[in-house]
């Protein structure tokens, strides 16, 4: 768990220099998922998607986090969009 907290601190620092970096926002979301902080993770994935709307890793991450907090309809939309963008990379969303 400590490594995720350390990573989050590094993401915060990196975003001061690159606030429009979708990959960093997405990585922060992944770290929050690992810490089971799903609502915060959704916020970070959504920020990544504001920067880069078709960023498949953020769509899947957001879908997973939304599922974890019971927002299954919204999650389904994220998975659907990801599958439309990258049908060959579609993860199982059930």
Give residue spans per PLM region.
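Register position in tetratricopeptide repeats
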Residues: 34-35, 68
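Conserved structural position within tetratricopeptide repeats
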Residues: 9, 13-16, 46-50, 81-84
